[in-house]
Amino acid sequence: MSNSMLDKNKAILTGGGALLLGLIVLFYLAYRPKAEVLQGFLEAREYSVSSKVPGRIEKVFVKKGDHIKKGDLVFSISSPELEAKLAQAEAGHKAAKALSDEVKRGSRDETINSARDVWQAAKSQATLAKETYKRVQDLYDNGVASLQKRDEAYAAYESTKYNESAAYQKYKMALGGASSESKIAAKAKESAALGQVNEVESYLKDVKATAPIDGEVSNVLLSGGELSPKGFPVVLMIDLKDSWLKISVPEKYLNEFKVGKEFEGYIPALKKSTKFRVKYLSVMGDFATWKATNNSNTYDMKSYEVEAIPLEELENFRVGMSVLVTIKP
């Protein structure tokens, strides 16, 4: 065989080998397991600044994007109705306190003196009636007075004796003042009236709403002059220091997202990668179930909601930024 034929065969073998190798590489690249990218979003804790008092908003002191400190004044409410209720509650408390003081102090000196005089008069009447009865009894024993006269004298004596006892009891009541039960009841009414004053005052303090945290104003829902219902969120705030990643994870990748496990995510908007730690996971509803297309090698997969906290402070991040998490094969 000539050298030319050998060279030709050699070239064919080399070309065939290269072609075969290329086919093998293409087959590998086509069918090798591919990395999957899951997309989640950054979220932050949101707070509503509202008031327990319904009324007309007097002024809103912040606007979207403002960074404010805890305790800063956010908005104020004008409530003339509440001020009227406070005046009413204070008047009720003054009346209840005056009544309680009167009961505690006891009867006036004039009342005590009057009760004593009535008792002394009844006592004198009883003494006179007793002496009269004794005289009539002696006359009756001697046959001078009739039985009727004696009975009348005795009845008069008994009546004046009971009148004296009743007058003495009233005198004792005047000396002792009100009963302990009356004093307790009057004091309780005073405390209840004071409680109403304190309740209205606490509501009045809430007409000036302050920031519950250090954070950023994310939205202002009402403006000055508008009516605000009780508990309505007038201003929304977010705490950018309390942020987390929320991501939907198919069931087959749950092993990569155990609670406490760390993983890396890429934030395209910030052009940086950062570490996250899983703090919570929970199954999502049936709407998030991945349905199998056949019954041979696949199954219906649930999706799980995973929340993970960043392990470093994210500068310049905004709520809603995407985070890409790559699952390696």
From Swiss-Prot:
Residues spanning the membrane:
11-31
Q: InterPro entries under this entry? A: CusB_D23 (IPR032317)
Q: Which domain of life is it from?
A: Bacteria
Q: What is the effect of changing residue 256 to D?
A: In strain: Hp921023
Membrane topology of this protein: Single-pass membrane protein
Pfam families named in the record: HlyD_D23
| One cellular-component annotation, GO | membrane
SUPFAM superfamilies in alphabetical order: HlyD-like secretion proteins (SSF111369), Outer membrane efflux proteins (OEP) (SSF56954)
Q: Could you tell me the keywords of this UniProt record?
A: Membrane, Transmembrane, Transmembrane helix
Where in the cell?
Membrane
Say which family it is in. Belongs to the membrane fusion protein (MFP) (TC 8.A.1) family.
User: What is the official name of this protein in its record?
Assistant: 36 kDa antigen
Q: What is the lineage of its organism?
A: Bacteria, Pseudomonadati, Campylobacterota, Epsilonproteobacteria, Campylobacterales
